[in-house]
Design a protein with these regions (language model features):
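Glycine- and acidic-residue-biased ligand/ion/polar-headgroup-sensing regions
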Residues: 85-103
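Short acidic-glycine-tyrosine-enriched beta hairpin
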Residues: 89, 104-137
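N-terminal leader/capping segments at the start of a protein or of a new domain
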Residues: 1-41
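A short glycine-rich, His/Asp/Glu-containing loop-to-beta-strand
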Residues: 48-74
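A short hydrophobic beta-strand segment most commonly corresponding to one strand
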Residues: 89, 144-161
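Conserved short histidine dyad/triad with adjacent acidic residue
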Residues: 68-83, 123, 133-135
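Short beta-strand His + acidic residue motifs that chelate non-heme Fe in jelly-roll/DSBH
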Residues: 79-81, 99-100, 132, 137-143, ...
Length: 170
């Protein structure tokens, strides 16, 4: 049975109204996984090869969370980052993303980026979804074209984010 954007948004909102914290986000993660695995959902919302890298599909007027489609062509490695005071859920729909979790070893200060050390790497394959709560630092790496669904706790266009870079190896 097809999972529509309207059903997806309604399920996410109900989960976050019940619990806006980590438990509610974990429930939302299951809906992200469901949408990523739904062929009709992917065909409708994640098949436009001319789409910009990030497209907001839905922004909740009350809770402010966003459902975004991400389109990445070819290989790309992103820098370590967090989502400011917000959170995000990444769901893999097409291709594979290798995620790296990072630990902050020196906070950003005086206009200098924070320094991070690698904690672990793990793949996100189609249907996999992962919650990144406030303060969780991570970076995606793609060897080829990918499509993702990302839930943002609020529209990240309006969130100040601190820059990070890898600490030098001793």
């Amino acid at each position: 049975m097809t999972y529509t954007l309207e059903e997806f948004a309604r399920d996410c909102k109900a989960a976050l109204l019940k619990d806006p914290g980590p438990a509610g986000r974990e429930e939302v993660r299951t809906y992200v996984s469901r949408a990523c695995l739904d062929e009709d959902f992917r065909d409708k919302h994640l098949s436009d090869n001319d789409a910009p890298p990030r497209t907001i599909l839905y922004e909740d007027p009350d809770l402010k969370f966003c459902i975004c489609a991400h389109f990445y062509e070819g290989a790309k490695e992103s820098s370590p980052h967090g989502h400011g005071g917000s959170w995000a859920i990444y769901g893999q729909a097409v291709g594979q993303t290798v995620m790296t979790d990072w630990q902050c070893v020196q906070p950003a200060s005086d206009g200098k980026p924070g320094l991070v050390e690698k904690v672990r790497d793990y793949p996100l394959n189609p249907g996999d979804a992962h919650v990144y709560n406030e303060e969780d630092l991570h970076s995606p790496s793609r060897a080829d074209t990918t499509r993702l669904i990302r839930i943002e706790g609020e529209n990240l266009d309006h969130v100040t984010r601190v820059p990070y870079k890898k600490a030098k190896a001793a």
